[in-house]
Amino acid sequence: DLILIPGGDGIRHVLHEKVISETLKKCISSNIPIATVCGAAAFLTKANILKERRFTCLLETYEKNRTLFEKAIYTGNQLEKDELIITAKPTALAELAIEIGKMLHLFKNEKQMDSFYSFCKGENE
């Protein structure tokens, strides 16, 4: 199992919904990984999950929400993995897919993982 939360400007309409924070807290306490894309990392901060954890999103998103992210450690990297949490910029979706696959033990071997990565990058046509 894994929770994947896409980002986008629409998150601001539901960011303060308590049911989302409660669900994410239950996932973490049940050892269910959570992956977010860009601004969706804000859901993790609202649930107090990113406190003192490394995360990433677009710099513009971070700067617009600096106070929301003040207890987290912003890196600006393409992708961050911190225990059960994966955060990624929208420019790192192939890398995110690989990290999710590794976390869920979906690849039989390195060759399969490399082939999947190439496919995600549009290199296997």
Question: How would you label these PLM feature ranges?
Answer:
Residues 1-35, 39-125:
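Active-site-adjacent pocket-lining segments in enzyme domains
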